[in-house]
Amino acid sequence: QHASYLDQIDRDAWNPSDYATQLTRRARGLPFWFSLAVHGTDKYRAAVEHTLSIARDVAAGIEAMPHLELVKHPELSVLLFRRRGWNTADYQAWSQAAALDGSILCVPTTWRGQTVLRLAFTNPDTESRRVLDVLDAMR
């Protein structure tokens, strides 16, 4: 069998889709590569550094709130915290309500056998103050 539609058209030009692990799967690295090619590594570096800064700012804000406890300091842009006095059902209900009203996507997870909340920052346009305002309203 020969599938001519799979042949490389231009063998002299580098094409990232030729490096997919299987021809039946899309080249998952292509969107990232394209974004790097368009925006450049300096903008990516700045965006990543900004999300790390957001995570640190939010962690510091959580530590200042008496009703919250920072469980795990940020690793890259992910942190864990708990609301003092809440149980698993409380976390589930709050998380669902917050997602439905569009205020925040903050989902429960389990850390060392305890239900906690997880925040992962990936959007450099996220504003620390808005996140902290939502968390402050958990009182």
Each model region followed by its residue ranges:
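Active-site C-terminal subdomain of aminotransferase-like
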Residues: 1-66, 73
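Short, hydrophobic beta-strand segments
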Residues: 34-35, 80-82, 117-122
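A generic structural motif
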Residues: 38-42, 85, 123-127
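Generic non-transmembrane alpha-helical segments
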Residues: 57, 61-65, 93-104, 137
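Conserved PLP-binding catalytic core of the aspartate aminotransferase-like
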Residues: 69-98
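Conserved PLP cofactor-binding pocket of PLP-dependent enzymes
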Residues: 73, 78, 101-118
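PLP-dependent enzyme catalytic core of the Aspartate aminotransferase-like
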Residues: 111-139
